[in-house]
Amino acid sequence: MVTPKQIDFSSCVGADNSNGTLSHRRSPRNIPSSKRAASVAEEETMKKKMKMKKKKKKLDPPLIVRIWNEEDELSILKGLVDYRAKTGFNPKIDWDAFCSFLGSSIVERFSKDQVLSKIRKLKRRFHVHSEKINQGNDPKFTRSSDSEAFGFSSMIWGQGDDDGMDKEHEVNGNGAAENRTNESGEEMLKEHEEEVANTELLNENGAAKTTENGTSSGKERHDEDNDDDDELCAVQDAFEAVMSQGLSGYQKKLQLEKLMNLGNGKRRELSDEWKALCVEETRFNIKKLRFSAKLAEAANDS
């Protein structure tokens, strides 16, 4: 009788292990080790993401930044003029009622304290400009809206009315609040001089060169250059305000070049005369605005 031939599979699939299972099967111990590796990698990734988020939060700027612009300042000044006309020009202002009167364009973006702080700054700025004008100096408006803002301010504080703001925000009785006001006014007066405060011609050792009489030659030269630039700007401003209308581009260029090449004496004469006219015009506009305020007050009283 033929017995079946036993086939040996060991040559094809390898030898059996001690448990009788095929050697090509994976050990169950390999599965948890791979899961642990994946888990560790995932934890490292999460830690990196958390660190990045924390770092980003530190670097991110504040979400809400309150910035006043020219339109906001004019809105407040116009609002004060209208509110005073509505309340019969009462010198004592109810600031809570005024903030409600301003409307959502300001109130929704700024708090009452921010509004009052801005009004105090506008009031100080007006008094600084008024003092310079009364002394016969140019107020030097740096923005296009400064002249308009000064007009509204003169209607509010030009008569010297006490709006109660300074007393309401006094800090103590030793004059601390008053000192801050004076310091702020002095800072405004000096803000146009700070840019040229320390510009002197230096020698090789880093010291300012001095002349025989002990004065700084660099400072004198710098002052002369500033005077020349100021005179040129004044003459150019006068030309654009008085003569340039109706001229072609070429005519403007030709005549302006001639004015820029004038001698120092003639140029200084024209510059001084134009500055004097500007001061007179500013004073006239102030008087006109004050008269407008009186006229509006009389119309509301009758």
Curated annotation (Swiss-Prot):
Q: Which GO terms describe its biological process?
A: defense response to oomycetes; regulation of DNA-templated transcription
The record's statement on gene disruption is: No visible phenotype.
Induction context? Up-regulated by KNAT1. Not regulated by gibberellins.
Q: Where is this region: Non-canonical leucine-zipper?
A: 270-291
Q: Does the keyword DNA-binding apply?
A: yes
InterPro entries hit by this protein: GEBP, GeBP-like_DBD
- Where composition is biased (Polar residues), the residues are 208-217
Name the major location.
nucleus
Q: Kindly give any further remark recorded in the entry.
A: Overexpression of GEBP results in a reduced plant growth, a delay in flowering, a reduced anthocyanin accumulation, a delayed senescence and an enhanced resistance toward a virulent strain of the biotrophic oomycete pathogen H.arabidopsidis.
Q: What is this protein called?
A: GLABROUS1 enhancer-binding protein
Give the lineage.
Answer: Eukaryota, Viridiplantae, Streptophyta, Embryophyta, Tracheophyta
